[in-house]
């Protein structure tokens, strides 16, 4: 991204090392970006602090006994994890490390089970707190709180879609069932998972009530997760090194991409690409709905060959003038863009979440592609449903914000 932007500026006779350096620094000199390392830290604490096991045990106590029960455990756990870290890769790794071996040992289809867990993992980029939505909000100048609140209903629709699809796939399957737990056992499992379950509620209520900003929400989440993990005796001093190293690695990658994208956005702007794009698209259609449909199809293709965060940083500056020309709500579009590109995380050949699942299950990408196909289909339907009925997002987003 940095190289291509530099080449473009050179071609435009605007290559200047001081200008490039200034834009690079400006790319990270943004207060809301501080939320990213804290949410990354929350995910690492959850991974190393024993929180994952408590959440999965609670979900198992509730639905593990029904046919295909471990699939429902994965879906419920994915929803809860989504409200904790905001990272699809972290959530998929945490879920998969426990559930994939368990499901395979219970005679569940390996490819389909891994596909479900990967599909559940990407809910974390839609449900608040979402790291890609923070990136989008900063790039587009949209309210991050509004984006967070607007992602709630689509995220729940994705959960319902996975639930119905899994029910159809496993309606006649005789997999090993977990023992139905008693009310007392469920209560014990709930008590053990209570404090982690409280974190998503704290974040949503805090943002909705104006108690803290999205950046402060990241700090609250990290401190809260740390206190809970220490109280559970899951996070020890020996594990802190791994927690901080993991946080530093992922944060530095995201920040470098964000800084490089600022140079790319500058090059795209001075080349007048957005202006040309507006004029071209206006000749195709006058309908905002048809325009959204065309853009969503385009972004689906982009998601197959490019990771989510670079795609957001590259294409938002290009598409923003088009959205304004058609009076499309930029917060609504941001939610749609994140949902769309998140599908690319579980689509070959670049799908990073799919490779996480492959690494855990030891299955090839070809086999996983077949296993995840039904869930991709459902996600595509949900996305198009929101394109043609934007009120599904806009009404609750405005109310919750």
Swiss-Prot record:
A GO cellular component entry from the record: plasma membrane
Pfam families: DctM
Family annotation (PANTHER family): 2,3-DIKETO-L-GULONATE TRAP TRANSPORTER LARGE PERMEASE PROTEIN YIAN (PTHR33362:SF4), SIALIC ACID TRAP TRANSPORTER PERMEASE PROTEIN SIAT-RELATED (PTHR33362)
Family: Belongs to the TRAP transporter large permease family.
NCBIfam families xref list: dctM
Source organism of this protein record: Haemophilus influenzae (strain ATCC 51907 / DSM 11121 / KW20 / Rd)
GO molecular function: carbohydrate transmembrane transporter activity
Protein name, as recorded: Putative TRAP transporter large permease protein HI_0050
Membrane topology, from the record: Multi-pass membrane protein
Residue intervals passing through the bilayer: 31-51, 70-90, 115-135, 144-164, 193-213, 217-237, 253-273, 290-310, 330-350, 353-373, 375-395
Keywords: Cell inner membrane, Cell membrane, Membrane, Transmembrane, Transmembrane helix, Transport
Localisation per UniProt entry: Cell inner membrane
Organism domain of life: Bacteria
Organism placement in taxonomy: Bacteria, Pseudomonadati, Pseudomonadota, Gammaproteobacteria, Pasteurellales
